[in-house]
């Protein structure tokens, strides 16, 4: 399969730079996986699409202010993007500089360069940085960090992004990108879903900066997926198995929830799904056998991204590309701050041949 099979034309004007004033007021494109039928609606229509007893699985990661500016003590300007927090003092990060710092280099971080840190080691493209400060990494990031808006949101981060670029149920700090499908859920909608009898469970996947890395190979089977830490606790496993047992659906909110659940299913030894606390490099593209997820809430993804490949594996390649074509024609808003889709699983997707 070629990466170019997942390309589509997207006018610049359809990339959303700000979210809707009200989280749940965005548009919703419904894609029926088995037939490919499309229905246009608004996000709150989700309420009518879910049945009592269906299980919504959310990702409760919280975005950290992961972008830092500063300079090397020796002079040159640097930009640091945290990939993950290693412990209370150390981070693993991407560093952009005219000349990469060497191990032992002193860094002066923050807009006022008040935070002292040392680059201690290099691991491939990533740098290990230790803060020389009594405060924890999280406290330092909260005081001097900028929200890591995706590269296609072409504006500086604003104070408002600290809340707008978080889900209302975010709980565990560690992501450098929001699980954006969840941005559309506000408290009134969650309350109505609960009142209807829709069940809810929470996994954690700390989204890494790798989520924005372009696929740099021609053939997708050659792509090496970035690694992210995921947690699928016992209560989620129990909720999934119970939903399946009573004939209800498991609905993943976002591709990160999909990847968490399907990673836990892949690693399971005895049951359909078992608890999972580990790094995952799961790469889902057409031909993948889904085991857990029956329906998916997701935003519109970048052309040639691993995420549009994941959706194609779920709904079927042709159905997915047709839906994206319709979304462009109907001027849906794309990417992190954009509109959403609700997609049901297409069991025939696995048999589809792409690009032949």
From Swiss-Prot:
Any one GO cellular component localisation term in the record: cytoplasm
GO BP annotation list: queuosine biosynthetic process; tRNA wobble guanine modification
Gene that specifies this protein: queA
Compartments (UniProt record): Cytoplasm
InterPro entries found in the cross-reference section: QueA, QueA_dom1, QueA_dom2, QueA_sf
Protein family: Belongs to the QueA family.
Domain of life, per lineage: Bacteria
EC category name: transferase
Biological pathway: tRNA modification; tRNA-queuosine biosynthesis
Function: Transfers and isomerizes the ribose moiety from AdoMet to the 7-aminomethyl group of 7-deazaguanine (preQ1-tRNA) to give epoxyqueuosine (oQ-tRNA).
This protein's UniProt keywords: Cytoplasm, Queuosine biosynthesis, S-adenosyl-L-methionine, Transferase
Reaction(s) catalysed by this chain's protein: 7-aminomethyl-7-carbaguanosine(34) in tRNA + S-adenosyl-L-methionine = epoxyqueuosine(34) in tRNA + adenine + L-methionine + 2 H(+)
Protein's organism: Escherichia coli (strain ATCC 8739 / DSM 1576 / NBRC 3972 / NCIMB 8545 / WDCM 00012 / Crooks)
Protein name: S-adenosylmethionine:tRNA ribosyltransferase-isomerase
Chief localization: cytoplasm
Coiled-coil portions: none
EC number: 2.4.99.17
Molecular functions per Gene Ontology: S-adenosylmethionine:tRNA ribosyltransferase-isomerase activity
Self-association state and partner proteins as the record states: Monomer.
NCBIfam families per UniProt: PRK00147.1, queA
């Amino acid at each position: 399969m070629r990466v170019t099979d997942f390309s589509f034309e997207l006018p610049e004007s359809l990339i959303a730079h700000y979210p809707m004033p009200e989280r749940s007021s965005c548009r919703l494109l419904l894609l029926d996986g088995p037939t490919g039928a499309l229905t246009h609606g608004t996000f709150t229509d989700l309420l009518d699409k879910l049945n009592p007893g269906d299980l919504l699985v959310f990702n409760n990661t919280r975005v950290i202010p992961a972008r830092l500016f500063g300079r090397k003590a020796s002079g040159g300007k640097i930009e640091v993007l945290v990939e993950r927090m290693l412990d209370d003092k150390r981070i693993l990060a991407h560093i952009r500089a005219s000349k990469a710092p060497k191990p032992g280099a002193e860094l002066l971080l923050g807009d006022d360069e008040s935070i002292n840190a040392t680059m201690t080691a290099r691991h491939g493209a990533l740098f290990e940085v230790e803060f020389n400060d009594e405060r924890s990494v999280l406290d330092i990031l909260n005081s001097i960090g900028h929200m890591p808006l995706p590269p296609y949101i072409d504006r500086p981060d604003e104070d408002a992004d600290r809340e707008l670029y978080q889900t209302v149920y975010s709980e565990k700090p560690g992501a450098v990108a929001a699980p954006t499908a969840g941005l559309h859920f506000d408290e009134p909608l969650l309350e109505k879903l609960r009142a209807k009898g829709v069940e809810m469970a929470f996994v954690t996947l700390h989204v890494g900066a790798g989520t924005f890395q372009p696929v740099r190979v021609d053939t997708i089977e050659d792509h090496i997926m970035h690694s992210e830490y995921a947690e699928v606790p016992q209560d989620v496993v129990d909720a999934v198995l119970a939903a399946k047992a009573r004939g209800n659906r498991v609905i993943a909110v976002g591709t990160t929830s999909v990847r968490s659940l399907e990673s836990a299913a892949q690693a399971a030894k005895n049951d359909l799904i078992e608890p999972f606390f580990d790094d995952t490099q799961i790469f889902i593209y057409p031909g993948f056998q889904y085991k857990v997820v029956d329906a998916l809430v997701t935003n519109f993804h970048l052309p040639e991204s691993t995420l549009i490949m994941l959706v194609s594996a779920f709904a079927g390649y042709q159905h997915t590309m047709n839906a994206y074509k319709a979304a462009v024609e109907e001027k849906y808003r794309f990417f992190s701050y954009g509109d959403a889709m609700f997609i049901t699983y297409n069991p025939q997707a696995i048999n589809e041949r792409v690009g032949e």
